[in-house]
Structures are given as structure tokens and as C-alpha cells.
Amino acid sequence: MEWDSESDGAGSIGAGEEEEEEEEEEEGGFGGGGGGGGGGGGMFSFAIEGMLRASGPCGLVVTDALEPDCPIIYVNCGFEEATGYRAEEVLGRNCRFLQCRGPFAQRRHPLVDAMVVSEIRKCIDNGTEFRGDLLNFRKDGSPLMNKLHLTPIYGDDETITHYMGIQFFTNANVDLGPLPGSLTKEPVRSTRFTPDNFFRPISTGPGQSNFCREYSSLFQLTDEVLCQSILSRLSPRDIASVSSVCRRLYLLTRNEDLWRMVCQNAWGSETTRALETVPAAKRLGWGRLARELTTLEAVAWRKLTVGGAVEPSRCNFSACAVGNRVVLFGGEGVNMQPMNDTFVLDLNASNPEWRHVNVSSAPPGRWGHTLSCLNGSLLVVFGGCGRQGLLNDVFTLDLDAKQPTWREIPGVAPPVPRSWHSSCTLDGTKLVVSGGCADSGVLLSDTYLLDVTMDKPVWREVPASWTPPSRLGHSMSVYGGRKILMFGGLAKSGPLRLRSSDVFTMDLSEEEPCWRCLTGSGMPGAGNPAGAGPPPRLDHVAVSLPGGRVLIFGGSVAGLHSASQLYLLDPTEEKPTWRILNVPGRPPRFAWGHSTCVVGGTKAIVLGGQTGEEWMLTEIHELSLASSTV
């Protein structure tokens, strides 16, 4: 199952570094391998001939090089006979466990030659064959000498997709003494399952309490309990791994209802509801949708032409998505004329076209504002630059109302008027506003929150002992429920204003929220994470993906009008790493944050091509995140 094409774990199949965590038992490298070096030794067919001539048991193991840590996907009967491990006990694990003495050992045995293990790692890193001998252990703890021939297998695109290991096992003349806590020969007595003994070892005899994998209490649970109480709490990646453990779990993980629960628990109800509104996503199915949105294997650009018109022509408008519709409000017309009209583009239509929305009580015209969508079809506009200067007013519009009407929200204690700020929404009811440009060009660094569903909404400034440098043109994204991520913008740096690539996060669920510098180029001691980060920019596009990841592209980059390269960051990682995402198709020449929105959780819509000062809003680019939406 191709679940992590970006993982760097493929190189660890044979290495087996000692770690402090208990998971090390599960991390075994190619159990064999020996002191002979690797490299381009003879043809693999010689090993096949040797296997046929061998008088002793010969193991055959195949691992998936595209999965993290190269899990085993096949072992033959010879492997089972020689090692004492059954196939269902080792599938999904890395072969490194053979370097540990017994099924409960957590570290590589000290007699295993570390130089040989290092040589195996080097061969895997270089994509070359390996031949050699290495000490391994049977399940009962007795030593084996493994003469291993390891070879990479290439796919059609010259990428290593699998590793195949042929193992000739012989008894090793090593006196290790008895295995500590070894199992008795007495048959295992069945234990009736109760909630109290679920996490306890199953007794194997009087005075014994060794866990017996053959009679795991987990499998005494019903399918319903396994799905609803255990599997549904795992991440999509974990479900994909669990499905390879045994036939029963494989069949359970084929269930679409289970996948929906997994997606909802991992991504949140709001994201799941948005995905349910996309017809193409429904046809794809939750299992495949989870895979494609996790691996981004199907991401692609395409260009569309739509009908209708947005007139008069304008720039510096704001756009957002309501279901599968794109809504455009306001903008800057000829001679800096502020606009206050509303247009809708329905992407569900067979022939999408821009349509002017007849609304009542339109807000004052503006540009440099933000437009966001709350629960359902409720739009909210904040701030911007109007005919009389900067604004700090709030208006809402129910797009699905019989007679759509803009309604002003008279919030108490509003923030100072501003433009080119950034905003995002929380819980479908709250508007978060950050930074921007105030009167006389002063940059701001404050953060405010407003619950627009309250009878008497009150603006609340989020207190923080330290704030990032003041800025405009940055992006704000929500992940992990109530965490927000700030990226880029034009930031104050002493007397200067410089484009930024800094990343800051804040958890609004904390009793005393505070800003934390995740990474960046301009913060003392911050440094950049591993990988090539995006160049500093402002007015870029930030696409929030299910699971908390953020895609960055476009905007104003030093020396360029826009940058089409996509960058991916997962702020939930222990050490967040920027990754470059290469996407097929033709990207837009220009992409700006104020004119791009995410539709249905499966695609980002970039509005308009720009020719000089003219915006062509009948030309749009679509970044599809799932294959069936193209």
C-alpha cells in the first residue's frame, strides 16, 4: 500500500540503530546481512540457484520500500520454519526484530555485528545489492547464522519499490545461556475476556505472566467494538498499516463507515461535512479519499474557463468558498474606486458562470478587506479601505436566504481600523483577525476574536506576553481544532519592512495562549527546519489540508511577481519540515491569497489571470487534491 512516498524511512530497512523507545522491537532491519560488503556483487539469479540447492531452510522476504521503515509484505514457509515466527506475526514489521533475542526483546543483541548492520544500511542508501552473514535469533531465542542476499527491485520509473531478501539459515555455535523468562512447554490456557484483563498478559502457567501473541485479547473483541472503540481512533496512515496485519483486520478496514469515522476523528467534523458536499468525493469513497488527501499522490493543476462576467473590472477584491460555490465581494475599481457588489460562481453547475447577487443593505465599498465563511452559508466581511479611509466594521450575509441581506454586527470594543490584515474562522462561529496596516501606514501585531453568533458580540483581544513582529499580507490557517498558524507577510524588522518566511503558531484552547516561533529566517535562534523552505513572501496562498498540514504557494516574492512552486509543512510533526511538492499540470502565472479559496476541502480555486492591470475572472486555475475531482 503506497502510503508515504515522501518518507525517508526506506533507508532504515537494515540498519537497526538502538533506540530508547519500546517501539524498537517493531523496527527490525533486514534480519540478515553480513560481513561481506555490499555493492554490485553477482547476479541475483545466482542466489536463486543457491536457494534451490540449499539443503537447510531458506527464507524469502519481500518488503515495501515505499512505506515508512520498509515493512514486510511477504515471507515464505522457509522463513517461518527457520525462525519460528508465523507470517501474521511479522507482516507490517521491519525485519530488524530478528536481531533481537526473543519476541519480547527491545534492543539489538550485543553480539550482533554493528559493522555488518552499518554495511547493510550503506547498501540500501546506495540502492545496491548486499551479501553477507549476520547473527539472528529464532522466536525461542536460539541463535541462527543468516547468510543474506539482499537486492532492490525497481519500478517502471526507475524508483526502488521493494527489497527482496533471500536468507540461508544455519545453526550458530554461540553459547548464550537460557533466554530470560523463557516460555514453558505447557499449553496455553484460554482466558475469558473481561475489561479488567484486556491490557494484562495472558497467563501461560502457574507463576507465569508472559504475553502470548497467539492468543491476544484484542482479537476476542467483536468486530463492532474493534471498529467503533479502537480502529476509529487511529489515523488514516495507521489504518492502512493495520490492514496488513491479518485477514480479519484487512476485511474490517474495507468498511466505508469505518473510514468515515477515522476521517472525522482525524480531520474534524467541519472538514468531514465539507467533503460530504462534494459529489466527486462521494464517488471516490472515504478509503481512497483518505489515502489521496494524505499522500497527495493525485494532486494536479488544471485550467478552466467559466462564463458570465464580473463588471466593472476590479482588483484587490476578496473571495471565499461556500460549499462548492465561490463568492467574490468588493474590490478596487478604476481610480481606486471602492466596490461593494457580490458575485457567485457555482462550480456544481454544468456550465459554471459568474452571477451577480441582488442583495439588500450592501456594506460600504472597500478593498484590502477579508471575506470568510462561517457555519453553513453565512459570510462575514471585516475591515478594508473605503471611500473615507480605513474600516473596522463587520457585516454578515446569509447567501442561502430567500432575500440575501447584509447585516452589520455592532461589536463592542472593536480593533483599530485596518486593511491588508489576515483572518480565519474557528468553530464555525468565531472570526479571528490578525495584523494589517493602520492609519499612516503603521503595521499591526495584535490578534482579535469575535463570536458573531452572540446576541451582543464583543471583540476580545487575545492577550500575549510576546507577539511576532507586526506585519501585513500574511496568512492565517487553523489546524488541530483551535490552533492557528501564521506565515509570511511584509514584516517590520527594525526600521525596515521585509518579506518574511517566518512561521508562528498559537493554541487558542490554552488558558493563556502564547505565540511560538516554529521556524523562520528572521527570528533569533529559530532557524529553518530540514528541507528547502519557501522564499519570503506576502499576499500568498495558504491552503489548509486535512490533518493540519499547510500548502504555501504564490504571492509577492522578492524579484518575482509570483512563485508557482508549492511547499508543504506539517506543524504537528515533532520537527516540522518543509517539503517541495511537485505537481503535474500548468500552474497559474499569478496566485494571490485574497483571490484564492479552498472549495469542498478537495480543491483550491485561483481566480483570474492578470494581464497588466486587467484581471480576467473568466479564467480560473484549479489545484485538485483528489483524483476524482479533476
UniProtKB/Swiss-Prot annotation:
InterPro entries: F-box-like_dom_sf (IPR036047), F-box_dom (IPR001810), Gal_Oxase/kelch_b-propeller (IPR011043), Kelch-typ_b-propeller (IPR015915), Kelch_2 (IPR011498), PAS (IPR000014), PAS-like_dom_sf (IPR035965). Pathway: Protein modification; protein ubiquitination. Kelch repeats lie at residues 378-428, 430-481, 483-535, 549-601. GO terms for biological process: circadian rhythm; protein ubiquitination; response to blue light. Residues 216-262 form the F-box domain. SUPFAM superfamilies: F-box domain, Galactose oxidase, central domain, PYP-like sensor domain (PAS domain). This is Adagio-like protein 1. The lineage of its organism: Eukaryota, Viridiplantae, Streptophyta, Embryophyta, Tracheophyta.
